[in-house]
From Swiss-Prot:
It comes from Enterococcus faecalis (strain ATCC 700802 / V583). Homodimer. Heterotetramer of two MnmE and two MnmG subunits. This is tRNA uridine 5-carboxymethylaminomethyl modification enzyme MnmG. The gene is mnmG. NAD-binding protein involved in the addition of a carboxymethylaminomethyl (cmnm) group at the wobble position (U34) of certain tRNAs, forming tRNA-cmnm(5)s(2)U34. One of its GO terms (biological process) is tRNA methylation.
Length: 632
């Protein structure tokens, strides 16, 4: 194929899934000329697996994306068909918002947002190779011979890199949902010296809604109380006309069908070579691993308002098509169901993430960034969070500005990226609340208070969003201060109220703020005993006031740990340090440090196999020579 010189750009993003959409929008909105190339324009921000956004940890990521100026939260708020707050009976650290998406509306809305964006060109094309000169990425070449030059490239290829779909004994080259795979680019990345791994993920069958007997399933409705992912979505926009999901279960017959066909299951026959996700196992894997369980939950999730397709969550499988049909017909409510799409597994190449800097720039090739499933993660939200950060950092580098690296104490996005570049992953990585040490301060409700300032500083958060954030922040601070001034006296009314709550009465007067610290007392109950504020408070302000006061002691302890971490993050490790030359370091520590090349003492301390004694030796070694402090 003859090459020709096509247009030049500042940033080129390869792949328009959830990572690529965020990366391209972020770069363009920060003022750099951006090109977004993708294999098929009809699959921009497509949902090839579950038609949903959010859930534990993931929902917080969507809020963080929004607080930084990203798009995912706004997009799902326009296109959901059901919204639910999960874990409402638990503490605020694990509450999570989850939306059922109209997957076609979601993709169409995101594509149109991209098309309307200034500084951003969306184009269909298959990238076959990168233009690399003297170890620096300078652009891309497509299958049609177009050579696009740029100052930075972000690869967000999802599961397309040398993708292969597997259904029973059948295995063929394909991207997700029978789209075209990216073979040339996958091979080229290997040739450039990047270490590549092979992962696997899977998806369940889709069934026809009109053939489901919903009368024998359990209805799962959405919430009546307004909730949104984006801080800019008003309560008045809340969709009260929501679609339910439905709950059913596998049974012993289902399990017998799977058991007798395990000899045809690709994950047990050796056809599947890639490593699968531990936290999203196939149904055949669940039957083997949890043989004592008589049944497994299945959620029937509509894929949109204008389609009959229903996603059978919990039934991910790569068993042969005939077995999938038999399996479905054994499930209550699905006895006569028509399968519209067969479940499948997909294997794909991933860039081993220890080759990345915390900015998501590769260490091997300068100005080349990777994000999303290409880095070994699973999930749309994880992909979008990485895409946003890669796009931001590519733009900042071009502008000659300091990079934006979120710490573990800043957000789940920071936890995820640090896990990837510091610890790596040997299976598709999924964000969990348990991965965050500071989850009490990384909550769904306070992502704006944590990250809006950063988003505004880099030019992504627009003035209207920033002004609304400042108003909310001031209102929270003012109300906390007001509750610290008013006293509640042990009147008959107060004592009678406490008696109805089964709580101890007051001996002396108490500040309203301290009264609210009692676990059984709500803000509304405190409010009845003190004068009302001058202006009625937004429910989100009240929620924030209540959480900050009730959990003040725990939050204070967490913040003390954060400050200690910041001091360690401030101790930078010089580049190209020779760990083999440091006497006293354990052999494993030398190997791990040499491989990962941590940038700070804090990052080094989180590497598996590097113990506190190794860190002490490393700090002494650096302090005897030169130690660079992190700017700011």
């Amino acid at each position: 194929m003859n090459q020709y010189q096509a247009e030049s750009y500042d940033v080129i993003v390869v792949g328009a899934g959830h990572a690529g959409s965020e990366a391209a929008l972020a770069a363009a909105r920060m003022g750099v000329k951006t090109l977004l190339l993708t294999i098929n324009l009809d699959m921009v921000a497509f949902m090839p697996c579950n038609p949903s956004v959010g859930g534990p940890a993931k929902g917080v990521v969507v809020r963080e994306i929004d607080a930084l100026g990203g798009e995912m939260g706004k997009n799902i708020d326009k296109t959901y068909i059901q919204m639910r707050m999960l874990n409402t009976g638990k503490g605020p650290a694990v509450r999570a918002l989850r939306a059922q998406a109209d997957k076609h509306a979601y993709a169409t809305e995101m594509k149109h947002t991209i098309e309307k964006e200034e500084n951003l060109t969306l184009r269909q094309g298959i990238v076959e190779e990168l233009i690399v000169e003297d170890g620096v990425c300078r652009g891309v070449v497509t299958s049609t011979g177009a050579a696009y030059r740029s100052q930075a490239v972000v690869i967000t290829a999802g599961t397309a890199l040398r993708g292969e779909i597997i259904i029973g004994e059948l295995k063929y080259s394909s991207g997700p949902n029978n789209s075209q795979p990216s073979v040339g680019l996958a091979n080229h990345l290997k040739e450039l010296g990047l270490e590549i791994d092979r992962f696997k993920t899977g998806t369940p069958p889709r069934v026809k809604s009109s053939t489901i007997d919903y009368s024998v399933t359990e209805e799962q409705p959405g919430d009546k109380e307004p909730n949104h992912f984006s801080y800019s979505t008003p309560d008045s926009a809340y969709n009260q006309n929501q679609e339910p999901c439905w709950l059913t279960y596998t049974n012993e017959t289902t399990h017998e069908i799977i058991q007798k066909n395990l000899h045809r299951a690709p994950m047990f026959t050796g056809i599947v070579e890639g490593v699968g996700a531990r936290y999203c196992p196939s149904i055949e894997d669940k039957i083997v691993r949890f043989a004592d369980k008589p049944r497994h939950q299945l959620f029937l999730e509509p894929e949109g308002l204008n389609t009959e397709e229903v996603y059978v969550q919990g039934l991910s499988t790569s068993l042969p098509e005939d077995v999938q049909t038999e399996m479905l017909h054994s499930i209550e409510g699905l006895e006569k169901v028509e399968m519209m799409r067969t479940g499948y597994a997909i294997e794909y190449d991933v860039v081993v993430p220890h080759q990345l800097r915390p900015t998501l720039e590769t260490k091997v090739i300068e100005n080349l960034y990777t994000a999303g499933q290409t880095n070994g993660t699973s999930g749309y939200e994880e992909a979008a969070g990485q895409g946003l950060m890669a796009g931001i950092n590519a733009a900042l580098k071009i502008q000659g500005k300091e990079p934006l690296v979120l710490k573990r104490s800043d957000g789940y996005i920071g936890v995820m990226i640090d896990d990837l570049v510091t610890k790596g992953t040997n299976e598709p990585y999924r964000l969990l609340t348990s991965r965050a040490e500071y989850r009490l301060i990384l909550r769904h409700d306070n992502a704006d208070l944590r990250l809006t300032e950063m988003g505004h500083e880099i030019g992504l958060v627009k003035e209207e969003q920033y002004a609304a954030y400042l108003v909310k922040k001031a209102a929270v601070e003012a109300e906390i201060a007001r509750l610290g001034k008013h006293r509640i006296k042990p009147t008959k009314e107060v004592q009678a109220f406490l008696e109805t709550k089964g709580a101890a009465g007051l001996k002396d007067g108490i500040l309203a703020r301290d009264f609210l610290k009692r676990p059984e007392i709500s803000y509304q109950e405190v409010a009845q005993f003190i004068p009302a504020p001058e202006e009625a408070l937004d429910p989100k302000v009240i929620e924030q006031v209540e959480i900050q006061i009730k959990y003040e002691g725990y939050i204070k302890k967490a913040m003390e740990k954060v400050e200690k971490l910041k001091r360690m993050e401030a101790k930078r490790i010089p580049e190209n340090i020779d760990y083999q030359a440091i006497n006293g370091l354990a052999t494993e520590a030398k190997q791990k440090l040499q491989k990962i090349q941590p940038e700070t003492i804090a990052q080094a301390s989180r590497i598996s196999g590097v113990n506190p004694a190794d860190i002490s030796i490393l700090m002494v070694y650096i302090e005897q020579g030169k130690i660079a402090k992190v700017q700011g």
